[in-house]
């Protein structure tokens, strides 16, 4: 499938919904309802929100990656491993009917490209790391590679759910209780930590909405390394 065309099966605009702060389980229930509606002929949607502090585990999470102190974790049906969501992190859930033939790798790359474009627009040298999902800042002599955006999705009946998270001004210490995304030899960062000024969720929400829609519809070209080696790890299909 050419990157110059839409990955969506619908030509109707994506309905962007800014929901504020939503409990994780409530958002998951909303996603499932929107998938049912999309399969029945409804519109694609992009949910943009924040969660109260919560750990969620994808289907590939190993026992040693969970909090050692027994902190509760919500087990999900998405791809990927364990991560944290909470205040100061923008979470996006694209509920999108994919065009045939289904190309999950293409979908993941487009979401990554959208987040890379947002980070680049703020002056950061963001990109991909081969063999690892998400959006990263390169390592240097003082710091390792640092993940600023995470992706974990599910495809059910040809429709995506779950999605991505972009660290804006969240409390990064929340990641210290886990092995985030199963990666022990790299760091986690935020827009605020990298730019040296507070970057709120509200500041980037419009840009994220625009870039995600651009990427899904082919208006934002995808570049960078192939994600074939890890796409199966961040996506779960049914």
Curated annotation (Swiss-Prot):
Keyword Transferase: yes
InterPro entries: aa-tRNA-synth_II/BPL/LPL, BPL_LPL_catalytic, Octanoyltransferase, Octanoyltransferase_CS
Gene it is expressed from: lipB
Misc remark: In the reaction, the free carboxyl group of octanoic acid is attached via an amide linkage to the epsilon-amino group of a specific lysine residue of lipoyl domains of lipoate-dependent enzymes.
Source species: Mycobacterium sp. (strain KMS)
Function: Catalyzes the transfer of endogenously produced octanoic acid from octanoyl-acyl-carrier-protein onto the lipoyl domains of lipoate-dependent enzymes. Lipoyl-ACP can also act as a substrate although octanoyl-ACP is likely to be the physiological substrate.
Name assigned to this protein: Octanoyltransferase
Residues the record lists as binding substrate: 78-85, 150-152, 163-165
Catalysed conversion reaction: octanoyl-[ACP] + L-lysyl-[protein] = N(6)-octanoyl-L-lysyl-[protein] + holo-[ACP] + H(+)
Main localization (coarse): cytoplasm
UniProt-annotated site: Lowers pKa of active site Cys, residues: 147
Protein's pathway: Protein modification; protein lipoylation via endogenous pathway; protein N(6)-(lipoyl)lysine from octanoyl-[acyl-carrier-protein]: step 1/2
């Amino acid at each position: 499938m050419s990157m110059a065309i839409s990955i969506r099966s619908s030509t109707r605009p994506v309905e962007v919904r800014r929901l504020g702060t939503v409990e994780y389980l409530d958002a998951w229930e909303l996603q499932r309802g929107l998938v049912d509606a999309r399969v029945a002929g409804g519109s694609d949607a992009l949910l943009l929100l924040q969660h109260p502090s919560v750990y969620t585990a994808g289907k590939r999470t190993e026992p040693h990656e969970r909090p050692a102190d027994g902190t509760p974790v919500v087990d999900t049906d998405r791809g990927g491993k364990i991560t944290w969501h909470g205040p100061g992190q923008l979470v996006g859930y694209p509920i999108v009917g994919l065009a045939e033939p289904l190309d999950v790798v293409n979908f993941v790359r487009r979401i990554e490209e959208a987040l890379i474009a947002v980070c680049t627009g703020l002056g950061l040298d963001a990109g991909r790391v081969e063999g690892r999902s998400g959006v990263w800042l390169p390592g240097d002599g003082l710091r390792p590679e640092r993940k600023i955006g995470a992706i974990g999705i599910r495809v059910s009946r040809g429709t995506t759910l779950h999605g991505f998270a972009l660290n804006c001004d969240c409390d990064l210490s929340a990641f210290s209780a886990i092995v985030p995304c199963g990666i022990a030899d790299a760091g986690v960062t935020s827009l605020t930590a990298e730019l040296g000024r507070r970057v709120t969720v509200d500041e980037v929400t419009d840009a994220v909405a625009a870039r995600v829609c651009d990427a899904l519809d082919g208006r934002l070209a995808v570049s960078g390394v192939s994600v074939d080696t890890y796409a199966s790890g961040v996506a779960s299909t049914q």
